[in-house]
Amino acid sequence: MASSVLNLFKSCRPFTPIRFSSLPKSQFRIQFPLRPGKETQLRRCFTTLSSLTDGGAPISGGKELWLHNTMSRKKELFKPKVEGKVGMYVCGVTAYDLSHIGHARVYVTFDVLLRYLKHLGYEVSYVRNFTDVDDKIIARAKELEEDPISLSRRFCEEFNRDMEQLQCLDPSVQPRVSDHIPQIIDLIKQILDNGYAYKVDGDIYFSVDKFPTYGKLSGRKLEDNRAGERVAVDTRKKHPADFALWKAAKEGEPFWESPWGRGRPGWHIECSAMSAAYLGYSFDIHGGGMDLVFPHHENEIAQSCAACDSSNISYWIHNGFVTVDSEKMSKSLGNFFTIRQVIDLYHPLALRLFLMGTHYRSPINYSDFLLESASERIFYIYQTLHDCESALGEKDSTFENGSVPSDTLTSINTFRTEFVASMSDDLLTPVTLAAMSEPLKTINDLIHTRKGKKQARREESLKALETTIRDVLTILGLMPTSYSEVLEQLKEKALKRAGLKEEDVLQRVQERTDARKNKEYERSDAIRKDLAKVGIALMDSPEGTTWRPAIPLALQEPVTTTP
């Protein structure tokens, strides 16, 4: 099974002393509704599982990781510049409003990469900045009659709350532009001294025609490029694509003193300065959304190389867009949903699963159906693990390798192999999530085993399977603090989406029970269907009727159109 999956998806120093120590090509799209963290947890993951193969030998895979490099336009074997250490910079948000789920996709993507690198044993210096000096921030501050820096700091805090909800690990450092003006000025000085920039009336522009390889990341030719700014083309520029490194102060805008007079940094120079400050000019991974390839990352490369000719980033990694009706979700288009809006109705871990259900480089279309599918799937996962926990009771979760039945070991090893194969192949999270179905099914089968040989060694199997899945969930950032708590939260969200309270559901359950006793089967079926339409599924058992969240029948029914 693992082989079929593989076949199918087959030296300058920084200018400021605050740095950290530091498969073959294929393209495809995966998107489908799936059915059924802590640092110490990440270090612990798979320490037990590595000995679960015949003879105690760990499953092959090691530290091999293939990542798609935007620069080379192909998958490459990951090799860090310094053995055992990884430097990673991801462009952060421009903080002037609540973040939308397009932002969530970026940072969940790189959180998965961060977690997997840690799982592989790397020491990761992860830098994710905040842009708190920008035209959009200034405009929003004027609109709200608020100080721009104060407004931005407020939304930086809101962003961090969103990331905590999505179980994204904290970066090693989160630098803000306003705290790094001296470093930015130093970098601009270096670029000017090296002859790659020019001054115009207090502004400093980068001269793109002085940089022969400009466009190598995006594949654009210089003559085809538009200005690399967020404002209209300035006729004072030598070339239309020249972009601002420093902007002269305007009345009512924040400014800082510089050798060129009062002003503020341009957009692109900020990330070049902060990445060099913490990671140096040469590091491993630079990431962000696909929309940053041009002009932002293209301009970063030009600036950094102009300041230091040995500047080099090994891997440029970009995630695909979240779309709404095939258009990119963005604040500027006004077609966005904030993270807060989504997690008001759906559990944050359901949103995380939704984002991981499509390969990170492919576009993902926002829809209620896919979010409902993710919510149903995550409920199934946690319910299965909760039932497993209940079946084991207070028993010690540790187990001896030799006590686990061979068929369980086979199931675990198959899943482990699929996990390594899919994650090492450019982070194929959809394949990993799909592969989880088999061990979950095995747990459910074992829980309902009451006699025979399986019952005799049931506990050892359940312990081993639960440990396996728990460790994978931890690496994926999907492990909750408590199965029971998150199940209750998922039910609360489902009730909110349905516009019901639990007592309403329980009353309908009782009405249905009475109808069945009276052999009013049509009424009984109608009650079940009414609840199913709004995402409440009823489950009958000898102990009575219970309910769980499900994809609303109204979303599952095909839409009919009249000619």
UniProtKB/Swiss-Prot annotation:
Kindly state which reaction or reactions the protein catalyses.
Answer: tRNA(Cys) + L-cysteine + ATP = L-cysteinyl-tRNA(Cys) + AMP + diphosphate
| Protein name according to UniProt | Cysteine--tRNA ligase, chloroplastic/mitochondrial
Q: Which family does it belong to?
A: Belongs to the class-I aminoacyl-tRNA synthetase family.
Residues the record lists as binding ATP: K331
Q: Which PANTHER family does this UniProt record tie to the protein?
A: CYSTEINE--TRNA LIGASE, CHLOROPLASTIC_MITOCHONDRIAL, CYSTEINYL-TRNA SYNTHETASE
List, in alphabetical order, the GO biological process terms annotated in this UniProt record: cristae formation; cysteinyl-tRNA aminoacylation; polar nucleus fusion; regulation of programmed cell death
Quote the gene name from the UniProt entry.
Answer: SYCO
Name the cofactor(s) required for activity, per the record: Zn(2+)
Q: Where in the cell is it found?
A: Plastid, Chloroplast; Mitochondrion
Tell me the null mutant phenotype. Embryonic lethality when homozygous.
Motif placement: 'KIIK' region: 136-139
Q: How is the cofactor bound?
A: Binds 1 zinc ion per subunit.
Give the matching InterPro entries.
Cys-tRNA-ligase (IPR015803), Cys-tRNA/MSH_ligase (IPR024909), CysS_C (IPR056411), Rossmann-like_a/b/a_fold (IPR014729), tRNA-synt_1_cat_dom (IPR032678), tRNAsynth_Ia_anticodon-bd (IPR009080)
Per the UniProt entry, the disulfide pairs are none
From what organism does this protein derive? Answer: Arabidopsis thaliana
| Transit peptide listed as a keyword | yes
Its EC number is 6.1.1.16
